[in-house]
């Protein structure tokens, strides 16, 4: 016969676990909102920066300009910037991006191209360092909602690697935020910058909304057509010098965007995982409660049978 006290203790344990998972789900939902607000708040700056870049680009013959960040060279070594999270309990978020990075590293090795990692997030750092992978720089313990200062620090390291020709190309491997239940690990070239592709034609922003008591994501296409500055605008400095100064800023902005998307993907994955855990806890509580009631009924029936048997014996 099942132990009633043991079942009762398990029910209480599952109840306590459900409280924790539900709290984590709500915290993740609140942080997803903050991540979305941050993406929205940085967009005006990004659009203005693109206006200036396009205007300068139209006034220069880029193939003749000395712009190190746009210069293509023979690729002998690739820097792989991998962005993961610091924590677990977020489904397959970290595992998927690490798998994507490993696959890309194998492709480069098969092509006879060297590579080295720049790792963002404790999960990536632990995984690749434990496997003695070539690592140039690591970043862990960043804010869960990324800041421009953090993106700038990482961008400075990438610029140093690229301009010193320690690497000839830098690729970004991060998770693109698609929806609360879906994320997409992607590989994107960061350096050298391609002036013809300063904007992503699939650029979108996302809004977290509540509908029918459940969280949903609304995505909105962002206009990628950038208006040029007035033709009669005069730049006091040489446009080439201005462009050389603005391109690192553009790189930092692109990196901040990737960090924000990665953070939103991680939080959404954690929210979904905790929601599933809460649902599973509810189902387990129902099963345990049913088992408890059956055990109680069996115990009562046995006691009655023993009383009746004792009475008959008299």
UniProtKB/Swiss-Prot annotation:
Keyword Thylakoid part of the UniProt annotation: yes
Keywords annotated in UniProt: ATP synthesis, CF(1), Hydrogen ion transport, Ion transport, Membrane, Thylakoid, Transport
Transmembrane regions: none
GO molecular function, one term: proton-transporting ATP synthase activity, rotational mechanism
Pfam family membership, one: ATP-synt
InterPro entries tied to this protein: ATP_synth_F1_ATPase_gsu (IPR035968), ATP_synth_F1_gsu (IPR000131), ATP_synth_F1_gsu_CS (IPR023632)
Location relative to the cell: Cellular thylakoid membrane
CDD domains for the chain: F1-ATPase_gamma (cd12151)
GO cellular component, one term: plasma membrane-derived thylakoid membrane
Domain of life, per lineage: Bacteria
Gene3D superfamilies: 3.40.1380.10, ATP synthase, gamma subunit, helix hairpin domain
Membrane topology qualifier: Peripheral membrane protein
Function: Produces ATP from ADP in the presence of a proton gradient across the membrane. The gamma chain is believed to be important in regulating ATPase activity and the flow of protons through the CF(0) complex.
Family: Belongs to the ATPase gamma chain family.
Assembly and interaction partners: F-type ATPases have 2 components, CF(1) - the catalytic core - and CF(0) - the membrane proton channel. CF(1) has five subunits: alpha(3), beta(3), gamma(1), delta(1), epsilon(1). CF(0) has three main subunits: a, b and c.
HAMAP family per UniProt: ATP_synth_gamma_bact
Listed name of the protein: ATP synthase gamma chain
């Amino acid at each position: 016969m099942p132990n009633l006290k043991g079942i009762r203790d398990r029910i209480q344990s599952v109840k306590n676990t459900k409280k924790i998972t539900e709290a984590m789900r709500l915290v993740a939902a609140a942080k997803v909102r903050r991540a979305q607000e941050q993406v929205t708040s940085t967009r005006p700056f990004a659009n203005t920066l693109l206006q200036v870049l396009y205007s300068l680009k139209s006034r220069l013959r880029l193939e003749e300009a000395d712009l190190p960040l746009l210069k293509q060279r023979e690729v002998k070594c690739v820097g792989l910037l991998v962005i993961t999270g610091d924590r677990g309990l977020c489904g397959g978020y970290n595992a998927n991006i690490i798998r994507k990075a490993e696959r890309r590293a194998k492709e480069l090795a098969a092509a006879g191209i060297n590579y080295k990692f720049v790792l963002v997030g404790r999960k990536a750092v632990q995984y690749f360092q434990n496997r003695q992978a070539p690592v140039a720089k690591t970043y862990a313990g960043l804010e869960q909602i990324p800041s421009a200062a953090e993106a700038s620090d990482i961008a400075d390291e990438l610029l140093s690697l690229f301009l010193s020709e320690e690497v000839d190309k830098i690729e970004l491997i991060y998770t693109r935020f698609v929806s609360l239940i879906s994320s997409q690990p992607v590989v994107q070239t960061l350096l050298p910058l391609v002036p013809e592709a300063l904007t992503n034609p699939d650029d979108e922003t996302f809004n977290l909304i509540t509908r029918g008591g459940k969280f949903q994501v609304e995505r909105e296409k962002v206009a990628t057509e950038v208006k040029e500055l007035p033709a009669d605008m005069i730049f006091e400095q040489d446009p080439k010098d201005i462009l050389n100064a603005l391109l690192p800023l553009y790189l930092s902005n692109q990196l901040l965007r990737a960090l924000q998307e990665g953070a939103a993907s991680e939080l959404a994955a954690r929210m979904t995982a905790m929601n599933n855990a809460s649902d599973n806890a509810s189902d387990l509580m129902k099963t345990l409660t049913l088992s408890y009631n059956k055990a109680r009924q069996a115990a009562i029936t046995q006691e009655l049978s023993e009383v009746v048997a004792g009475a008959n014996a008299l």
